[in-house]
Amino acid sequence: MTNKKQLQKLELIWIGKGEEPKLEPRILIENPEYSYGDPNCENMLIHGDNLLALKALEQDYAGKVKCIYIDPPYNTGNAFEHYDDNLEHSIWLNLIFQRIKILYSLMSKDGAFCIHLDDQEVHYAKVVCDEIFGRNNFISTIAIKSSTPSGVKTSHKDKKIIKQKDLLLVYKKSDELRINPQYVRKSEWDTHFNYFINSDNKTVSSFLEVLKKNRILTQKQSIRDFDINNEVHRDFYIKNADKICQTQSHKNIELKEASRKLKDEILHTENAMFYNGRQLTPLSNSLNNVVYRDKIEKDFALLLCDFWSDIDFQNTQNEGGVEFPNSKKPEFLIQRILALFTETGDLVLDSFLGSGTTAAIAHKMGRRYIGIELGDHAKTHCYPRLKAVVDGEQGGISKAVNWQGGGGFKFYTLAPSLLKQDKFGNWVISQEYNADMLAAAMAKQEGFKYQPHESSYWKQGQSSEQDFIFTTTQFLTIEALDSIKDEMQPGETLMICCKSFQKECKGKYANITIKKIPQMLLGRCEYGKEDYSLNIINLPVEREDEEAEDAIENTSVQAISDSKKKNDQPSLF
């Protein structure tokens, strides 16, 4: 149990907190068979455990991701039906906490983080995010209408409130974030717009009378019959947006008095119009880009706030050309999020890629992206969907953003663990590593950027302009060391990682450090672990006897995750 004297801040405590594993920083290996399109593109589709993949990205992408959107599995309770509630929530929180900590490190200072949840865990998740980001960096909880109260959902309406929403927690990393305001189309005509500026630009008429005169409405109809969704009506108000006006009060007393003196004539100033003591505001001031019938165009709009009720969740089955029942998010939802927080060329990341929606939208919007998916969906869903995007598919937001195809992506897998135990239990370098993979892995382990020099074989990676690393599986002799030293320039330093070396090499040169592998790696991190997702079948079943509470308290979350798994058992993350 946590010592009360050690608690120095308000925080959420759960079983397993503080037991986070030391993750091995893996290298990523491109699989050309599943890469597609422009070979020089920067877009990445990663197949592998998302916690290990995030760790693999940390060195090269820390502080570079502009927008992170994740849609982790909701802790619905279905997966944990037979298990102790305290353990259930602890496991979910432990998994999400580890991932968000790395995601935070990947965010740029002007970046945004969005996590999509329902109300089962959102309040716990907010406390976790408050701890990682700081409460002062919380932006909003956005409620998104995701369903309608009908069918089976309403069968228990006498026992519970029917769920109709999802929730989006939004955080920033610092005050450098700038939000691009977005707008939504009004659902009906605003009857305050009841004036129409005549062609003389001096007088006004009743908007209703103008509509009747132009046979938009009949003589018996009222302004409430003006239908914003009628194409004829819509064309009329868009065409005449500078003439259709509403009146508003104004603080400038002199202008109000001057306007009253004109009596039924418009007073024009440099920046405004006044009529009978009130300011005339044209409809054109309320036109903004909105999504309308799968297009983005100017229309009568309201500022988008924290309740989104206009996105269709019911007809996403055909988007992207892949099936993903009950879990696929609408393309227009992701488009809105990326429009709020990113610009063309910004880097977007989704570590729970699912069917590939976030990557597909980022691609169509001209953003760079990294998508991570653990399961077979990486090949069966994400790959074909992104391939279709490159080829110019026209579903989802394609017409709205005038997507014509192009670009590309590269498909990566995580390298196996660098060290494995032999039959005697000793840690040895995995035989799956060739010389290049080993050099790249050691560079990552030591914080160097793997970038082999064209002419100097021993300059395999560097951490600064004059600091280099060299990895070899050969026995390092004094002659080889002297040869390298002769090539080094003044001020250069070198780390050599090798399996063994001649004893005279040790300490011979002050600017050359020699380390033995694998000994130098032991104890640094957890080797041989390929999956940090949660197997939901093998959790300890809730016990009804009086020892249950003690059993739960002494259960390690890591031990649960490490329990024996079967290939056909689902994982939560």
Describe each region flagged by the PLM.
Residues 33-36, 48-51, 55-112, 120, ...:
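SAM-dependent methyltransferase catalytic-core segment centered on the flexible catalytic loop
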Residues 5-18, 89-95, 122, 330-399, ...:
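Conserved S-adenosyl-L-methionine
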Residues 123-143:
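Conserved Class I S-adenosyl-L-methionine
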Residues 139-171:
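Class I S-adenosyl-L-methionine
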Residues 370-573:
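PRPP-dependent phosphoribosyltransferase catalytic core
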Residues 41, 48-51, 56, 146-147, ...:
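Flexible, glycine/threonine-enriched loop-and-boundary segments that flank and lead into catalytic domains
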Residues 1-67, 76-98, 276, 498-501, ...:
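DnaQ-like (DEDDh/DEDDy) 3′-5′ exonuclease domain used for proofreading
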